Amino acid sequence: MLNRRQVLSLIGAAAAAGMLSPAAAEILRSRELPSSEVAALFTQFGRTHRMPEALGRWLKDPAQQVIPPYQVFDNVWYVGLRWVAAYAVKTEDGVILIDTTHEPFAQHFIRNLETVGIDLKDIRWVLMTHGHFDHVGGAARLKPLAPNARFVMSRRGWEEAFHDARGEQGFAMLDQPDVTLKDGETVSAGSTVVTLLETPGHTWGTSSYLYNVKDGSKTRRAVTVGGLGLNAISGPEQLDAYIASMKRLASRELAVEVDLTAHPFSIGMTEMIPDIEKHIPGGPHPLADRPAFCRRLQALARGAQARKKELFG
């Protein structure tokens, strides 16, 4: 039986070469999972803190995780993996990225950027939602290739990232924090302004990013919510923070219409790709659905309330 380091080595070699060795293929033999099943397996993982075998194989399988990039809106491209998102927002003055995926797939993320015509020297901002490896784990590979980019997170997000990077299941991380934003602060490139919202709950350092997307003659308000899972809960106060964050994200004040999720399986986004690609600019868009977004947030808040009662009485 190979250990975790050997497994990751096999995966990395396979991802770099674009093929699987026989040993890696045997270890990673998995099947395609629909979003609903992935979500159910992650719920199971959050409750038991034990990775379901089928989910673990699916997450590590290049044949499942490596997907081509696609255009989501006139100014937004999906450049991430099947299970974890990364977005490229093109502006008149460079590119804004949201999240960086993780190793051993970060080279695929970078290849996706190049595929959609992005010169890495044109990246202005790399906005990271929180410190978990799947969101910041590609930053170390990207940084030397994107010399003009600034890397952004909240203070607690940076703290979590460096704590996790030094842990037993550690990962390569930047040498030090770059740009630290507080709740409500913004970055901009061209006419695009992105606001950081501190939305603790998934972790204490989780942030979400609020920005406009272009859809033909329409401008729609979008958000990338940093995290929705309850797999890292430390106490009832964190669940209270989670519930408050869900309510804030659903508020009329923010007026979010588009959920550009950090994890596609949470909204069935992978299954929407054909409709997204067929979308006529300015027409109905599969992701432009404020009522559905608010219903999801309300359901998540109810789930967190139930989890609080179950765990803490």
Label every model-predicted segment.
Residues 2, 14, 26-62, 216, ...:
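Accessory terminal helices/loops
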Residues 105, 131-137, 158-161, 204-207, ...:
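Active-site environment of divalent metal-dependent phosphoester hydrolases
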